[in-house]
Amino acid sequence: MSDAKELKQVLTGPIVNNNPIALQVLGVCSALAVTSKLETALVMALALTAVTAFSNLFISMIRNHIPSSVRIIVQMTIIASLVIVVDQLLQAYAYQISKQLSVFVGLIITNCIVMGRAEAYAMKTPPMMSFMDGIGNGLGYGAILLAVGFVRELFGNGSLFGVQILHKISEGGWYQPNGLLLLPPSAFFLIGILIWIIRTYKPEQVEAKG
């Protein structure tokens, strides 16, 4: 029973209580770049979740056989291999989205969330818990990406997943899109607003002053 409770905590904790973007402020760079559309935000979230989960799993499985002096190199090799697999799958089955994501899929290799969970969690924890931790952190990352992507695409272009929701004036409708929301800096402010909302709801996440 305690194992099931711990597993649930590992899976759901990073979504709100210990969100990698909102609390730890990790992985922000890719969040700024890929959230102009919900479609790219979703694919990026799935890609990072897969890489984080499986890198955690594989690193945890061999953690007792990795010399401390080369552990970062081993972790990077495993993560890079998984990123290459994910990138090739995207190019094979979702080429247009792969083109839109551009270099940001490859940059998952250096994403702080993936590296951080491998070093801080997978190196010290059994495989199943490490795998679920990777999924949980991927879901936490994805939740922020989807929230930001929803606002940016809906109010920046009047659409969701490419389907027109708010009919634009240029097409005979009533809505004037806010072009600023399609620029990367808008994501920075939206993430800041989300962090403020979460920390207002959960004041224990606010850093102590002084």
UniProtKB/Swiss-Prot annotation:
The encoding gene: nqrD
Protein name: Na(+)-translocating NADH-quinone reductase subunit D
Topology within the bilayer: Multi-pass membrane protein
Principal cellular location given in the protein's record: membrane
Source organism phylogeny: Bacteria, Pseudomonadati, Pseudomonadota, Gammaproteobacteria, Alteromonadales
Example of a GO cellular component annotation carried by this entry: plasma membrane
Reactions catalysed according to its record: a ubiquinone + n Na(+)(in) + NADH + H(+) = a ubiquinol + n Na(+)(out) + NAD(+)
Keyword Isomerase: no
Subunit-structure text: Composed of six subunits; NqrA, NqrB, NqrC, NqrD, NqrE and NqrF.
Transmembrane segment boundaries: 14-34, 42-62, 72-92, 103-123, 131-151, 178-198
